[in-house]
UniProtKB/Swiss-Prot annotation:
Family classification: Belongs to the PsbT family.
Location (main, coarse): plastid
Transmembrane segments: 3-23
Quaternary structure (record): PSII is composed of 1 copy each of membrane proteins PsbA, PsbB, PsbC, PsbD, PsbE, PsbF, PsbH, PsbI, PsbJ, PsbK, PsbL, PsbM, PsbT, PsbY, PsbZ, Psb30/Ycf12, at least 3 peripheral proteins of the oxygen-evolving complex and a large number of cofactors. It forms dimeric complexes.
Function: Found at the monomer-monomer interface of the photosystem II (PS II) dimer, plays a role in assembly and dimerization of PSII. PSII is a light-driven water plastoquinone oxidoreductase, using light energy to abstract electrons from H(2)O, generating a proton gradient subsequently used for ATP formation.
Membrane topology: Single-pass membrane protein
GO CC annotations on file: chloroplast thylakoid membrane; photosystem II reaction center
Protein's name according to its UniProt entry: Photosystem II reaction center protein T
GO biological process: photosynthesis
Keywords: Chloroplast, Membrane, Photosynthesis, Photosystem II, Plastid, Thylakoid, Transmembrane, Transmembrane helix
The keyword Transmembrane appears for this protein: yes
Organism per entry: Sorghum bicolor (Sorghum)
Amino acid sequence: MEALVYTFLLVSTLGIIFFAIFFREPPKVPTKK
């Protein structure tokens, strides 16, 4: 059961880091439409 807990912690940590980097990006990105 410890493996499940470690997997959950790993996924949650990666998710937090991903969202932190994603939301830290400036929204004023030159979009070419």
